[in-house]
Amino acid sequence: MILVVGLGNIGVEYENTRHNVGFMLIDLLLKESNFTNLTNSKFKGELFKIGSSLLLLKPSTYMNNSGLSVKAVNDFYKCERMIVIHDDIDINLGALRFKKGGSSGGHNGLKSIDTLCGNDYERVRIGVGKGENVISHVLGKFKSEEEITLSKVLEHAKKALLELIENDDLSAISSKYSLKA
């Protein structure tokens, strides 16, 4: 079983914010897939299954406690692989990077996952840039001119993620799909 986690915050006030790009990519995948909804309160998030071996998770624990949801799903399904999609303020909007393991880079959602599940998982890092005030920036909505760039990056990230799930070769995917901005 492969678990793909899109990080974000629940609630209308957080829709279309920079911190929710993980949710956005999961939503894009669901829009184009036949899936089974496995959402259950024990998973602390929205959980979907595509085919026989792919789980998509949107934690409903808010960003800083994402690890609670990830651990609940991982413990129940004993997933062999985990891929986490998240915003990254250290790369510009329009950039896309891939990584396995390493530090959280100050990202509280990743810190929570690392604490409860370890850090040996693949990451899809979607650049959102860094504003003057980090918290206001990541919780802020995208400007209309940024939405065009975001849409292109999400579509590109979707293709990369689908290929990564299929081929399990992070290095090749990184070479083929990384974007600079």
Swiss-Prot record:
GO terms for biological process: protein quality control for misfolded or incompletely synthesized proteins; rescue of stalled ribosome. GO terms for cellular component: cytoplasm. The active site is at residue 19. The record marks 87 as: Stabilizes the basic form of H active site to accept a proton. Pfam families: Pept_tRNA_hydro. Hydrolyzes ribosome-free peptidyl-tRNAs (with 1 or more amino acids incorporated), which drop off the ribosome during protein synthesis, or as a result of ribosome stalling. Monomer. NCBIfam families: pth (TIGR00447). This is Peptidyl-tRNA hydrolase.
